[in-house]
């Protein structure tokens, strides 16, 4: 009754107005699952390939080739197979593609089908997606890492680092965490405006003021947390996503906004100093994706005190994660479904991290849609943390709203991760 009977893929637009792939998978019993694929602005060199058409249409960013692959070649390969056989279906698509980075069919085609299959199977089973994927133990609501100041590739301003986040660990529920985040977000808007800064928002819904340094951004956030009635370092902690690969040039870190250039060791020391000065408990991509020595230096300096998240470093790839674990590099992995391109491989990356006592953070991309699948996956995997942007833009809020619904559905079984995510 759960055999796949049809796949209908289409080209839709993401939150940046760029094309992306959406897939509907239909089953024999009438069940249907729909998934839309996100897209990143700052992408790791080792990510699975997002297939684009080239040419004049959509300035080369069309996805008709990926849509065609899903509708024809992929459907021909998996049509008739039970949707409950997720691993088999994903492996068939990976083998059908035949490349190490999914560049022939496109990770956007494969992922769209993979997620839609899981959602169709969940509907057929009468279970919410988080329960279908995660089983009876899926009950941990993640701490949101809310990106309220944007810089780097996500905004048109001088700030070198890409994201400045708040983590409301002092909340008792995800609903309360969202409220706390919203209050700080709106307080920050007033603080920025009062100082003459613009309050335009970036790709992920955070403000993109013309600040020149990380310290200036962090000072604004700390002040806003306090003015909103919360205690920095108790109710709310801070997090950074440096996206350091974006400003790593000729073996050095070029902080143009701050007017300085740092060697790897000095960059690690700078980040450790920021973490000591401010209530920072998480730094993502503090070093560049292939600067393994720099990552080791940063881990040795700060790895026992704070969470060091590998995004471009690991690209949700279990093989690269195992390399990092073996080398004692970082202590956490950022999990982006489109970096690896299938649900099975995504879950494998989370399991690999947890077995090595690394944390895992479920994450959106800067180019998103109204699809809220990652909210369910964060609960399904008991990650305990989720990155899905700021407290504005419907493409970001869709995930927060879904987490609130999941918490409501879990009732007394629901647990909010809260302070359990803090290291040291």
Swiss-Prot record:
GO cellular component assignments: cell surface; extracellular region; phosphopyruvate hydratase complex
Binding-site residues, (2R)-2-phosphoglycerate: 162, 336, 365-366, 387
Cofactor binding, per record: Binds a second Mg(2+) ion via substrate during catalysis.
Pfam families named among the record's database cross-references: Enolase_C, Enolase_N
Binding site for Mg(2+): 241, 284, 311
EC number: 4.2.1.11
Catalytic activity field: (2R)-2-phosphoglycerate = phosphoenolpyruvate + H2O
Highest taxon of the lineage: Bacteria
Key words, A-Z: Cytoplasm, Glycolysis, Lyase, Magnesium, Metal-binding, Secreted
One Gene Ontology molecular-function label: magnesium ion binding
Active site: 204, 336
Record function comment: Catalyzes the reversible conversion of 2-phosphoglycerate (2-PG) into phosphoenolpyruvate (PEP). It is essential for the degradation of carbohydrates via glycolysis.
Name of protein: Enolase
Organism (species): Rhizobium etli (strain ATCC 51251 / DSM 11541 / JCM 21823 / NBRC 15573 / CFN 42)
Lineage, highest ranks first: Bacteria, Pseudomonadati, Pseudomonadota, Alphaproteobacteria, Hyphomicrobiales
Primary gene name: eno
